[in-house]
Amino acid sequence: MFGAGAMTNSIDEIRDTDFLFVIGSNTTEAHPIIAMEMKRAVRQGARMVVADPRAIWLTEIADMHLQLTPGTDVWLLNAMAHTIVEEGLCDEQFIAAHTTGFDALKKTLASYPPERAEITTGVPAESIRRAARAYATTRKAGIYYTLGITEHTHGTDNVYALANLVLMTGHLGVRSAGLNPLRGQNNVQGANDAGATPVFYPGYQRVSDPDVRGKFENAWGVELSRDDGMNLNVMMKEMARGTIKGLFVMGEDLVLSEPNVSRVEEGLNGCDFIVLQDIFLNETARFADVVLPAACFAEKGGVFTNSDRRVQLVRKAVDPPGDARADWEILCDLARAAGYPMPAYDGPAEIYDEMAALAPKFSGISHRRIEETGDLQWPCPSTDHPGTPTLHEDGPVIGTAHFEPVHYRESDELPDSEYPLILSTGRTLYHYNSATQTRRERGPVMKQRGSFIEVHRRDAGKIGAHDGDEVRVLSRRGAVKATVVISPRMRRGCVWMPMHFAEERVNLLTNDAGDSVTGTPEFKVCAVRIERT
């Protein structure tokens, strides 16, 4: 819709914003440094609205908490947009100059009044209207979201609905405003920038574009596929069907991180050959035929790109232990062993130069320049360009932004009499993703030793469970044990569990139904029940 797969604005702009709409983001636990900027903005007078099924820490300082039912984001966002149109709060000048498709959007929004949204979301209609008015009438108003928006079968629709809000209010190309996805891991942005996706080459250039493909074929001296690749969720399903016979796994613990993990394990058992490249022997290592020891961040050089497109150097501090090597060295040797004449790169700087020469967004970025400036934000199209802290200041980078009307679609799996609760999963402050690293550290383990399930008091009371009791959590795919935490943060009918613990893998429960565009699984909604042990 805008032409850039990243934050439109910079992290350091958050402190100067006047309004923050935080949706699907437990920012203080998943992005604590960014949360510090949000807290600073609120201390300086900014208003904050949080939309989340749980009462996260930010709700304590927010002006409003829209505690919606998991999976009903499109209803909430369309109802906010309905209010903005109905009350004449749109930026008509921006819409006329920079967008298309607004009339079609208005027709869709007519079916989403806040009063009807209240029935589905559980959020009072007047709260929806107040949030919409506050967002639309504040010039420096930013939207911040993470996996609570994208980890749904309709995650792409959620993002479209957010983008529609930004466009109709003219909050694009404005400092301390915009649409800002906060990336789930360090350098996820950089990995995507470099083409670690099934549909893009480096710099978000389409695999399906013959001119793009020809450029990379000439540069690399190979014939490239005309077809998009498989996303990870599709790969796991094809592996379970026996279509995929070999797997190369880098920095990923599949049997802890992927949904419906019993099916993943079936697929791994059926593979003919599996290679694991990682810094530790994680849970997936049990299935590997070959393990290649990799260097961690402090044992190699290169660049990390953070959520706001900021490219920064990572400098090697110590040598890797034993046979461990930097990822790029391992990959180059593998390519040569497979018969491809991979260049004898001097190091990561030369590899980045190759990417920058082929990707216009990064043409002006090099290790040498970052050494001088400290960092650079793309797009940076030339060596004398200063980088771009705020995108779209001269209008959408694709020329004209297009509104994308979306309709509400139910989550793939809803609660019923057999499985009456909605389970969402996520991260905690003390552990990081699959906890391959943090559970090897004494401090985080002391703070949080094992799995737990947050439950509303009335839901726990239905089965006679008390705080600290051990229960079984069951879904249509599996069962795990967890310690009950009676939590005022939870909506009735909803429970929440962390994803970190190998002993009780919550992804034995989760649903691998994925978004039709991205394939991202629906980690945020699956039907479960709890039983006393």
PLM regions with names:
Residues 1-187, 206-384, 423, 445-485:
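Cofactor-pocket helix-loop regions in the catalytic cores of large enzyme subunits
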Residues 28, 150-151, 430-432, 504:
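Short, acidic Gly/Pro/Ser/Thr-rich loop/turn segments
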Residues 192, 197, 215, 348-443:
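Long, low-complexity segments enriched in small/aliphatic residues
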Residues 389-390, 422, 470-472, 529:
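Residue-level detector of beta-strand face positions
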Residues 399, 468, 491-493:
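Glycine-centered loop/turn motifs
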Residues 438-449, 500-504, 508-509, 515:
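Flexible, small-/acidic-enriched active-site or ligand-binding loops
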Residues 488-500:
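Short, solvent-exposed secondary-structure boundary/capping segments
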Residues 515-533:
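Long, low-complexity intrinsically disordered regions
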